């Protein structure tokens, strides 16, 4: 990164992208003897909060001021008002100290409107930056910031001139680092995935989902499971219109789900987002057996401890599949030697999902290449 002021850093999920950002920022602070402004961009408020926590576990705050620019409630000062952003940053800089800003792609334009000097900007899960609403601010900081880096495990390229993609070197620079997943597996940083495709009979759709998932859980003796559903509607139907939750409880499992529409639910009780993730990580570290269902909110970058397996109920693009697999290949106890990836096949979508998952695993873990998603039109 020191040899390039702009570029893409491609590292598989669990490979240490956040640590690269932190080390780069700390080195910058040590070598440049004046206050600097760092911006860290995340796709979700939840991930922005997590990144802030991880930064502050290592970076000393005696000469660094922390600002959050998004609509979430956090312990640090937070605002989306450009004038207040401008004032906060300039007060820190005028005293010769650093300003670290954590924001989301949704709110990045607010920092652009604040008209402040940004020395280094890190785009986490950078494949999100190509979205139509986010690209203008991304393009602006690519040109305006002194140093600009795009971190992702799953680049998104465009095959049409009418839509942005990370294969645009003027905005995204070149790939300056590409770490192959097999290397991380060999060195013991992440675990290899094991794909199990289970063909199941069809029937009433609601009960089919329930029975097929339960059969898959039973057959693989799983304790801590992530279920990737097709939609929030599918999760709600599974919980409300089948005996899935009763079946889980009979087997000694707790159950929980979180979506942007329904909020967080644990064993049928609505809870705060903070309690949900505290409980999820607590259960991940102890002997509690649980199933967590999600549509997309757990996919990108969120640290969830202890997950053994992901069960796909829906097809996704390469990014969604790769990110979901990434939740279960993080290191666990000595008994965890792989991350299980289960695809119950009981309709045409299931067959397509199985093929997509196999393709992603082959590309990332056998060929050692990133799973690139392509925009074709």
Task: Show where each model-derived region lies.
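Conserved helicase motor "Helicase C" RecA-like lobe of SF1/SF2 P-loop NTPases
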Residues: 232-259
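Conserved Walker A/P-loop ATP-binding site and its immediately adjacent core
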Residues: 18-20, 34-59, 73, 230-236
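Walker A/P-loop
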Residues: 4-24
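Conserved RecA-like P-loop NTPase helicase motor core
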Residues: 128, 260-372
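Post-DEXD/H (motif II) to motif III coupling segment of the RecA-like Helicase ATP-binding lobe
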Residues: 128-190
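Conserved ATPase-coupling elements of RecA-like P-loop NTPase cores
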Residues: 51, 109-115, 125-141, 302-305
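Conserved interdomain linker/interface between the two RecA-like ATPase lobes of SF2 helicase motors
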Residues: 173-242
């Amino acid at each position: 990164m020191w040899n390039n002021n702009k570029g893409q850093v491609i590292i598989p999920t669990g490979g240490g992208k956040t640590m690269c950002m932190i080390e780069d920022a700390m080195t910058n602070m040590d070598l440049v003897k004046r206050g600097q402004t760092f911006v860290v961009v995340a796709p979700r408020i939840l991930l922005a909060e997590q990144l802030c926590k991880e930064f502050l576990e290592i970076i000393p705050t005696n000469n660094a001021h922390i600002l959050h620019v998004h609509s979430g409630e956090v312990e640090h000062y937070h605002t989306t008002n450009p004038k207040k952003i401008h004032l906060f940053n300039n007060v820190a800089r005028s005293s010769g100290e650093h300003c670290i800003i954590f924001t989301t792609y949704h709110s990045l334009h607010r920092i652009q409107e604040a008209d402040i000097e940004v020395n280094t900007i890190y785009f986490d899960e950078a494949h999100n930056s190509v979205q139509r609403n986010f690209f203008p601010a991304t393009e602006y900081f690519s040109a305006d910031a002194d140093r600009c880096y795009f971190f992702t495990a799953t680049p998104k390229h465009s095959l049409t001139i009418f839509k942005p993609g990370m294969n645009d070197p003027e905005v995204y620079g070149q790939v300056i680092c590409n770490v192959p997943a097999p290397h991380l597996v060999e060195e013991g940083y992440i675990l290899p995935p094991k794909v199990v495709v289970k063909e199941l009979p069809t029937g009433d759709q609601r009960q089919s989902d329930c029975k097929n998932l339960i059969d898959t859980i039973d057959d693989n003796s799983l304790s801590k499971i992530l279920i990737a559903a097709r939609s929030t509607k599918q999760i709600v139907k599974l919980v409300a219109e089948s005996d899935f939750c009763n079946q889980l409880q009979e087997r000694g499992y707790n159950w929980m789900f979180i979506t942007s529409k329904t909020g967080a639910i644990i064993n049928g009780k609505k809870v705060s987002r903070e309690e949900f993730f505290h409980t999820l990580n607590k259960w991940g570290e102890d002997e509690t057996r649980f199933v967590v269902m999600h549509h997309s909110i757990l996919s990108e970058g969120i640290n969830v401890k202890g997950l053994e397996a992901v069960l796909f109920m829906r097809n996704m693009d390469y990014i969604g599949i790769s990110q979901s697999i990434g939740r279960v290949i993080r290191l666990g106890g000595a008994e965890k030697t792989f991350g299980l990836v289960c695809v119950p096949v009981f309709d045409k979508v299931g067959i397509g999902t199985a093929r997509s998952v196999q393709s992603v695993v082959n590309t990332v873990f056998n060929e050692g290449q990133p799973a690139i998603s392509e925009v074709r039109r």
